From Swiss-Prot:
Main location: membrane
Subcellular locations according to the entry: Cell membrane
A GO BP annotation: cell division
Name listed for the protein in its UniProt record: UDP-N-acetylglucosamine--N-acetylmuramyl-(pentapeptide) pyrophosphoryl-undecaprenol N-acetylglucosamine transferase
Gene Ontology terms, MF aspect: UDP-N-acetyl-D-glucosamine:N-acetylmuramoyl-L-alanyl-D-glutamyl-meso-2,6-diaminopimelyl-D-alanyl-D-alanine-diphosphoundecaprenol 4-beta-N-acetylglucosaminlytransferase activity; undecaprenyldiphospho-muramoylpentapeptide beta-N-acetylglucosaminyltransferase activity
Pathway: Cell wall biogenesis; peptidoglycan biosynthesis
Entry EC no(s): 2.4.1.227
Encoding gene per record: murG
Gene Ontology CC terms: plasma membrane
Source species, domain of life: Bacteria
Gene3D superfamilies: Glycogen Phosphorylase B (3.40.50.2000)
InterPro entries: GlcNAc_MurG, Glyco_trans_28_C, GlycoTrans_28_N
């Protein structure tokens, strides 16, 4: 039987693309195992799917001064030894890594055991963990065309990011019914992430009376960010977080306002939803969201507002522009080479396995 080890963790963004591959890998006859950290978020997400999970020690490799810099390298070395032992016992045909520091010892151990490893980079520029893994990888999957410039030409493949199948099964009527909306008024969906986006929430609420003249508004504002004083507005609903019904809300939405995390924007691309991206500022991140957003804007998929210039005026201008030009955004997304990532990556896994 064909066997594959998936790895990646530390954040949900390093796990959900792996989850998106699982159904396709099973269809191809793969026995799937997952290697992650002992207590990371990946353990909970993977075990509930019934996939065999194997924990290893994990340490973060920091580029700044921290007392843990003295202990974490030993955790990485321990994780490497544990990964080598696991790979010897599991004897997979291929390792697929979504990144995160737990993946580093797994990819290095795969190289040592002569098992081909494929790694995936979601952001425009490779993060530290993936940079450490690239020399040991057989292939490197990229999410953005620009990322190919940072990768060895003989290893780089533009695939996009795997998207969960259930997102494609949304029903517009179910989404409208869930929100108590009518079918004859367009819908604006705001996705602030699980923790919310304070500046985005403020801008939307400041502009709400104007937005409601043209749209019905679904506002996913993040944990603890619901403001009951806005419930009086007809055509406006707010939620901390939406789980199983998210696919229906996407189906109901005509346009979307979102942060610019790689997984989030690739979902918008796959669903062909015209969108406005408001990336995290460089001060609040390593700048990857800004680069992600600029790439999507350059390719004609998105309208971008830098957080520093976000205001009532810039947001209203963006919303009206994107809504009035929906067709051009959708057409650009249809022509993208970053779609069908699941099929492309599984094809690459098969190619590497057969070499």
């Amino acid at each position: 039987m064909k066997r594959i080890v998936l790895t990646g963790g530390g954040t949900a963004g390093h796990v959900t693309p792996n989850i998106a591959l699982i159904a396709g890998l099973k269809e191809q006859g793969y026995e799937i195992h997952y290697i992650g950290s002992y207590e990371g978020i990946e353990r909970e997400l993977i075990e509930k799917l019934g996939i065999p999970y194997h924990g290893i020690s994990s340490g973060k490799l920091r580029r700044y001064l921290d007392i843990k810099n003295f202990s974490d390298p030993f955790k990485v070395l321990k994780g490497y030894r544990e990964a080598k032992k696991l790979l010897k016992n599991l004897d997979p045909n291929v390792v697929f890594s979504k990144g995160g520091f737990v993946a580093v010892p797994v990819v290095l151990a795969a190289k040592k055991r002569k098992i081909p490893a494929i790694i995936h980079e979601s952001d425009m520029t490779p993060g530290l963990a993936n940079r450490l893994c690239i020399p040991s990888a057989a292939k490197v999957c990229a999410n953005f065309p620009e990322t190919l410039n940072y990768l060895p030409k003989e290893k780089a493949v533009l695939t996009g990011t795997p998207i969960r199948k259930e997102l494609f099964s949304g029903n517009k009527i179910k989404g409208l019914d869930f929100c108590g909306f009518t079918a004859n008024i367009p819908v604006l969906l705001i996705v602030g992430g699980s923790t919310g986006a304070l500046k985005v929430n403020e801008a939307v609420r400041n502009l709400l009376p104007t937005l409601l003249k043209r749209f019905q508004v679904i506002h996913l504002c993040g944990k603890g960010k619901v403001d009951p004083s806005f419930n009086k507005h007809k055509g406006y609903v707010q939620y901390e977080y939406i789980g199983a019904e998210l696919n229906h809300l996407f189906a109901a939405a005509d346009i979307v306002i979102s942060r610019a995390g790689a997984n989030a924007i690739c979902e918008l691309l796959a669903l062909r939803k015209p969108n406005i991206l408001i990336p995290l500022s460089a001060a609040a991140s390593r700048g990857d969201q800004i680069l992600n957003a600029e790439s999507f804007e350059h390719q004609g998929y998105s309208y971008v507002i830098k957080e520093e210039v976000l205001s009532n005026e810039t947001l209203l201008q963006a919303v009206n522009h994107v809504f009035d030009n929906q067709k051009s955004y959708i057409e650009a997304m249809k022509n993208s080479n970053q779609n069908d990532a699941v099929d492309k990556i599984i094809g690459l896994i098969e190619e590497v396995r057969l070499k």
